[in-house]
Amino acid sequence: MAKKVTAVIKLALQAGKANPAPPVGPALGQHGVNIMAFCKEYNARTQDKAGFVIPVEISVFEDRSFTFITKTPPASVLIVKAAGIEKGSGESAKGSVGSITRAQLEEIANTKLPDLNCSSVESAMRIIEGTARNMGVAVKD
């Protein structure tokens, strides 16, 4: 029989840099999870994605064991990195703070495709383009 899930915890952590300090320790500790085991496993799985924030969804079971799924980095982080800017615009309607090419947009869409609620790369590109526009980043042909 399958183990019963008692909690699902969602965190966004730096790739390869999870440690027992907040927010990881308190979030997992209250469910009785072995914090160091999670940190070691998460760091091992994400060490090749250094520099990105990687969202993770942790399922905690009755016997205090756990499994977790790592997601792709947030679209905004990928857009900022591609545009080579520090952060998006506070007032996106007034002007752009940077730009990305269609090729970069397609690359980001391909990266995000497994986590987006769509099936084609074209629709993923439209979603990412909307995110970029809201951040004040122009998409150039």
Curated annotation (Swiss-Prot):
InterPro entries: Ribosomal_uL11 (IPR000911), Ribosomal_uL11_bac-typ (IPR006519), Ribosomal_uL11_C (IPR020783), Ribosomal_uL11_C_sf (IPR036769), Ribosomal_uL11_CS (IPR020785), Ribosomal_uL11_N (IPR020784), Ribosomal_uL11_N_sf (IPR036796)
Claim: Cell membrane is one of the keywords in the record: no
Mod. after translation: One or more lysine residues are methylated.
GO cellular component terms, semicolon-separated: cytosolic large ribosomal subunit
Family label: Belongs to the universal ribosomal protein uL11 family.
Quaternary structure note: Part of the ribosomal stalk of the 50S ribosomal subunit. Interacts with L10 and the large rRNA to form the base of the stalk. L10 forms an elongated spine to which L12 dimers bind in a sequential fashion forming a multimeric L10(L12)X complex.
Protein name: Large ribosomal subunit protein uL11
UniProt organism field: Synechococcus sp. (strain RCC307)
Gene coding for it: rplK
